[in-house]
Amino acid sequence: MRIVSGKFKGRTIIAPGNLSARPTTDFAKEGLFNILNNNFYFEEVKVLDLFAGTGNITYEFISRGVEDVICIEGSAASARFIKETADKMAPGKVRVLNMDVFRFLKNCKEGFDIVFADPPYEMPDIDKVVTGVFEHDLLKPGGWLVLEHSVKLKFTDHPHFVEQRHYGKVNFSFFYKKEEESVLKVVE
């Protein structure tokens, strides 16, 4: 995997072969971060990375200046890899928790500007991730949830859904915690 922009642009990170995570493609990651960059000041946001996998998205956030990222990853080997890699890049800016995502959602008392979730595409009830973020009030006012998922899934009926973007086989659905009743469109 490669960091596409920021302080560590071009850096290649090679995950151990025993990690089963599927990193987000560079093409999709570049599209996603173009959208986020036009809507957030990265130096001022707090990020939660759910189902962090190899840490690919976390590394992109810290490369772009995010100072506070929490990663939740269920695999001990993956969590260890993320911690070691993030500590080399940006010591003290990334907290990695090796735990079940749903347990974290239920017990978390912090608020986030951006929550990124990349659950396994084949995970049943993937919508429980979206429900959990909103039920447990993890987004600050104006905060976004970005869910990576397969093309088969649609979330257009969810009350916080804003829009969906496609990048090859990768899809991102954007959900917004409204400060007001009006829904803002994602600025590209």
Identify the function of each model-found stretch:
Residues 1-188:
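Class I S-adenosyl-L-methionine-dependent methyltransferase catalytic core
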